[in-house]
Design a protein with these regions (language model features):
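Beta-hairpin "wing" of winged helix-turn-helix
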Residues: 53-71
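Short, hydrophobic-biased segments on the C-terminal half of alpha helices
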Residues: 49-50
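N-terminal helix-turn-helix DNA-binding core of bacterial DNA-binding proteins
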Residues: 3-43, 66-81
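A cross-family signal for key residues in well-ordered alpha-helices
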Residues: 10, 22, 53, 59, ...
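Amphipathic alpha-helical dimerization/coiled-coil segments
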Residues: 1-4, 22, 77-109
C-alpha cells in the first residue's frame, strides 16, 4: 500500500484517528490533551499520531518539552476530491435510474 490515497484512507479507517482529527480541527493539541477522551494509553495515542503523521494528515512540532500536533488539510482535500468524482457518478446514474423507473410507471398506467 504505497500510493498516497491508500495511506490516507487507511489512516482514516480507524475511529480513534478520526476522533483525533476532529479534535485537531479545533486547534493544536498535545498528546496528553488528545488522549483525554480515550480509554487508551499515551503510547497508543502516540502510535495513532505516527500513522496520521505518516499519512500527512497532521504535522507535529516541539516546543521545549511539549510536542503539539496540528491538522493538515491538504490530504483531506485529496481524499475528498477522489470521493467527489464517484459521488457525481452515482448522482448521475441514480438520476437516470429514477427517470427510467418513472417512465416505466407511466407506461404501466
Amino acid at each position: 500500500m504505497t500510493d498516497r490515497l491508500s495511506v490516507i484512507f487507511s489512516a482514516l479507517a480507524d475511529p480513534t484517528r478520526r476522533a483525533i482529527l476532529t479534535r485537531l480541527a479545533e486547534g493544536e493539541a498535545t498528546v496528553t490533551e488528545l488522549a483525554e477522551p480515550f480509554d487508551i494509553s499515551l503510547p497508543a495515542i502516540s502510535r495513532h499520531l505516527k500513522v496520521l503523521e505518516s499519512a500527512g494528515l497532521i504535522s507535529r512540532s516541539r516546543t521545549a518539552q511539549w510536542r503539539s500536533s496540528r491538522l493538515e488539510a491538504a490530504p483531506l482535500g485529496e481524499a475528498t476530491a477522489w470521493m467527489e468524482r464517484y459521488r457525481r457518478f452515482w448522482d448521475e446514474n441514480l438520476t437516470r435510474l429514477d427517470a427510467h423507473l418513472k417512465r416505466l410507471q407511466e407506461d404501466d398506467k
